């Protein structure tokens, strides 16, 4: 399972009539591998929530999203598992099938919410318009396999 994390001043998602937004916090692009499990979601949720990627008063990255009472916009993103080795069209065969991936995606978001964070979700499997203002920028890729960070 992969999660691309971006530190944001604000971010929003729109899909049809649906609109969701967050203020200062994180934008998460969440990719679920064909072998991902709830253990991977647990490991990533725990690490991301505790990661000190926000600046303290001295300008050092010393604060987590929990420390700043930040918000999270979580977007499903199967294209994080694109294979571009052959041809010109990416293959997405390493991404989990949508029905199972959606379950793990929602489970991951529930784990974030259980840690006391405001979590806004995108629309799984739908075309979305994502807007954000990066802060930094700070962009970090997190990955878990077999319930452990890699």
UniProtKB/Swiss-Prot annotation:
Disulfide cysteine pairs (residue numbers): none
InterPro entries, per database record: Daa-tRNA_deacyls_DTD (IPR003732), DTD-like_sf (IPR023509)
GO-annotated molecular function: D-tyrosyl-tRNA(Tyr) deacylase activity; Gly-tRNA(Ala) deacylase activity; Ser(Gly)-tRNA(Ala) hydrolase activity; tRNA binding
EC number from the UniProt entry: 3.1.1.96
Catalytic activity: glycyl-tRNA(Ala) + H2O = tRNA(Ala) + glycine + H(+); a D-aminoacyl-tRNA + H2O = a tRNA + a D-alpha-amino acid + H(+)
Sequence motif Gly-cisPro motif, important for rejection of L-amino acids, location on chain: 136-137
GO cellular component: cytoplasm
Cellular localization per UniProt: Cytoplasm
UniProtKB keywords: Cytoplasm, Hydrolase, RNA-binding, tRNA-binding
Biological-process GO terms, alphabetical: D-amino acid catabolic process
Transmembrane segments annotated in the record for this chain: none
Keyword Cytoplasm among record annotations: yes
Family: Belongs to the DTD family.
Function: An aminoacyl-tRNA editing enzyme that deacylates mischarged D-aminoacyl-tRNAs. Also deacylates mischarged glycyl-tRNA(Ala), protecting cells against glycine mischarging by AlaRS. Acts via tRNA-based rather than protein-based catalysis; rejects L-amino acids rather than detecting D-amino acids in the active site. By recycling D-aminoacyl-tRNA to D-amino acids and free tRNA molecules, this enzyme counteracts the toxicity associated with the formation of D-aminoacyl-tRNA entities in vivo and helps enforce protein L-homochirality.
Domain remark text: A Gly-cisPro motif from one monomer fits into the active site of the other monomer to allow specific chiral rejection of L-amino acids.
Subunit: Homodimer.
Protein name: D-aminoacyl-tRNA deacylase
Organism: Macrococcus caseolyticus (strain JCSC5402) (Macrococcoides caseolyticum)
């Amino acid at each position: 399972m992969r999660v691309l994390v971006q530190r944001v001043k604000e971010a929003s998602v729109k899909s049809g009539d649906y609109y969701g937004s967050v203020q200062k916090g994180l934008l998460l692009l969440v990719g679920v591998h064909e072998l991902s499990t709830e253990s991977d979601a647990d490991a990533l949720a725990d690490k991301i929530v505790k990661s000190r990627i926000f600046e303290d008063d001295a300008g050092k990255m010393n604060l987590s999203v929990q420390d700043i009472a930040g918000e999270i916009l979580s977007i499903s993103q199967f294209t994080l598992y694109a294979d571009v080795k052959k041809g010109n069209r990416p293959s997405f065969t390493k991404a989990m099938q949508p029905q199972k991936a959606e379950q793990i995606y929602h489970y991951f978001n529930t784990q974030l919410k259980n840690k006391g964070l405001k979590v806004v979700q995108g629309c799984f499997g739908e075309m979305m318009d994502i807007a954000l203002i990066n802060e930094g920028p700070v962009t970090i890729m997190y990955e878990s396999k077999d319930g452990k960070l890699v």
